Amino acid sequence: MQEDDICPVCGLPKELCVCEEVSKETVEKIKIYTEQVRPGKVVTIIEGLDDAGIDLQELASKLKRECACGGTAKEGKIILQGDHRNKVREFLIKKEGFSEDAIEVT
């Protein structure tokens, strides 16, 4: 068994590891909101995921593909170009397994 097949958090093989599911259940609040960066330009910001032990770069990549937009992950936030609040909320609930109660859209 290779070292990258073992979860660094719990030490179990990755196929038996449940750390990510447990961390998704214990997320306090994921905030999804928009912010105007320039006149006529809006970005969607997702924050509160860094506490869950989730790979922000990987999730940002999935969200960019789902929303067909550009974006980045930095400083504990995912920033997507455009207003994608509802798409992001549905994606996090249906495809990533987060609880509806843990997501706040403003």
Swiss-Prot record:
A Gene Ontology BP annotation from the UniProt entry: regulation of translation
A Pfam family hit: SUI1
Single GO MF annotation: mRNA binding
SUPFAM superfamilies, sorted: eIF1-like
Keyword Repeat attached: no
CDD domains xref list: YciH_like
Keywords: Protein biosynthesis, Translation regulation
Keyword Nucleotide-binding: no
The organism's place on the tree of life at top rank: Archaea
Family to which this protein belongs: Belongs to the SUI1 family.
HAMAP family named in the record: SUI1
The protein, known as: Protein translation factor SUI1 homolog
